[in-house]
Amino acid sequence: MVLLSKFDFSGKELGKFELPDAFFTEGREQSVKDYLVAIQANKRQWSACTRGRSEVSHSTKKPFRQKGTGNARQGCLAAPQFRGGGIVFGPKPKFDQHIRINKKERRAAIRLLLAQKIQTGKLIVAENSVFVSSLDAPKTKEALRFLKECNVECRGVLFVDSLAHVGSNENLRLSVRNLSAVRGFTYGENISGYDIAAARNIVVSEKALELLVESLVSTTKD
């Protein structure tokens, strides 16, 4: 069992968060790579479309006579060598090219990414009160002070909370969104593995981490 320190808004350690050993079971790094590639590939619209010589709108009249001009013979203005002509080997919308990742692979990849952050000391656990009741109004200065008190490197920080705190965490969300050190504010129930991989440091609420461990560890037992 792994113990993680829990911090309050003043940066004081108030206890430990217990992580089961099953959370750190070995997994395939290839699954992480496949998952991240799928996320990026599926952002594409796959809608690029060009017109070939048979699709462009042009007269079928021969540009000039076959012989006597000294030019190479031409038969149609829709040919690709003419301005406004068709495109050769241009992109076309093909079949559905979205990459599908099943739930088990997705959860395994997210678990491995989180385990790496924990093992390298890039994830800290904040008490639920930090997200819910620490601020009575949005205060960017106080949010920055919290990061410094917890010895969090102020670079690429990702805040992760639970959807159960939506609304009550609005003051903290508004406080951190204007910090250049903060990468984003998301929720554990719909977190993306790409956000975890791209973040340098993660500040997660106790409630969000409980939900993540429950969903990810139960998957490893199946």
UniProtKB/Swiss-Prot annotation:
InterPro entries: Ribosomal_uL4, Ribosomal_uL4-like, Ribosomal_uL4_dom_sf. Gene3D superfamilies: 3.40.1370.10. GO terms for biological process: translation. Keywords: Ribonucleoprotein, Ribosomal protein, RNA-binding, rRNA-binding. It comes from the Bacteria. GO terms for cellular component: ribonucleoprotein complex; ribosome. GO terms for molecular function: rRNA binding; structural constituent of ribosome. Part of the 50S ribosomal subunit. PANTHER family: 50S RIBOSOMAL PROTEIN L4 (PTHR10746), LARGE RIBOSOMAL SUBUNIT PROTEIN UL4M (PTHR10746:SF6). Belongs to the universal ribosomal protein uL4 family. One of the primary rRNA binding proteins, this protein initially binds near the 5'-end of the 23S rRNA. It is important during the early stages of 50S assembly. It makes multiple contacts with different domains of the 23S rRNA in the assembled 50S subunit and ribosome. NCBIfam families: rplD_bact. This is Large ribosomal subunit protein uL4. The lineage of its organism: Bacteria, Pseudomonadati, Chlamydiota, Chlamydiia, Chlamydiales.
